[in-house]
Amino acid sequence: MLGAALRRCAVAATTWAGPRGLLHSARTPGPAAAIQSVRCYSHGSYETDEEFDARWVTYFNKPDIDAWELRKGINTLATYDLVPEPKIIDAALRACRRLNDFASTVRILEAVKDKAGPHKEIYPYVIQELRPTLNELGISTPEELGLDKV
């Protein structure tokens, strides 16, 4: 049974769609066939939403986080196709405050607004959830700074 699955994967890896959508044999199967066969039957673990949130909250709550790690985390988080939960943003804002990096706080809030896209109800919800943290840390939103009119 495993051999049949490997053969199916190897065949899939050695064919390609031509300009009319017809399958043609690849010119040289090479090592891609072996790599593809492994991918066809592997079952990776999936991270739940709660595990994802906990991973990022833990990352930003590291007491020894430095400015480079903070920016790396913000950039990585911004590449995901999602709007981070308020608890992740809260942890990131607190990390910014520990590092006295006001520019990053504004950047985080602008990124959240951008990630919300056409869903106009998401950003106000996130700001509403973060309002106690923003007040506690003395952070102004981009709108309060007048940056939304630029």
From Swiss-Prot:
Residues 1-41 form a transit peptide. GO terms for biological process: mitochondrial electron transport, cytochrome c to oxygen. It is found in: Mitochondrion inner membrane. A motif (SIFI-degron) lies at residues 2-17. Its main location: mitochondrion. Pfam families: COX5A. The modification N6-acetyllysine is found at residues 87, 113. GO terms for cellular component: mitochondrial inner membrane; respiratory chain complex IV. Disulfide bonds: none annotated. InterPro entries: Cyt_c_oxidase_su5A/6 (IPR003204), Cyt_c_oxidase_su5A/6_sf (IPR036545). It is a peripheral membrane protein. CDD domains: Cyt_c_Oxidase_Va. One of its GO terms (molecular function) is metal ion binding. The modification Phosphothreonine is found at residue 141. Component of the cytochrome c oxidase, the last enzyme in the mitochondrial electron transport chain which drives oxidative phosphorylation. The respiratory chain contains 3 multisubunit complexes succinate dehydrogenase (complex II, CII), ubiquinol-cytochrome c oxidoreductase (cytochrome b-c1 complex, complex III, CIII) and cytochrome c oxidase (complex IV, CIV), that cooperate to transfer electrons derived from NADH and succinate to molecular oxygen, creating an electrochemical gradient over the inner membrane that drives transmembrane transport and the ATP synthase. This is Cytochrome c oxidase subunit 5A, mitochondrial. It comes from Papio anubis.
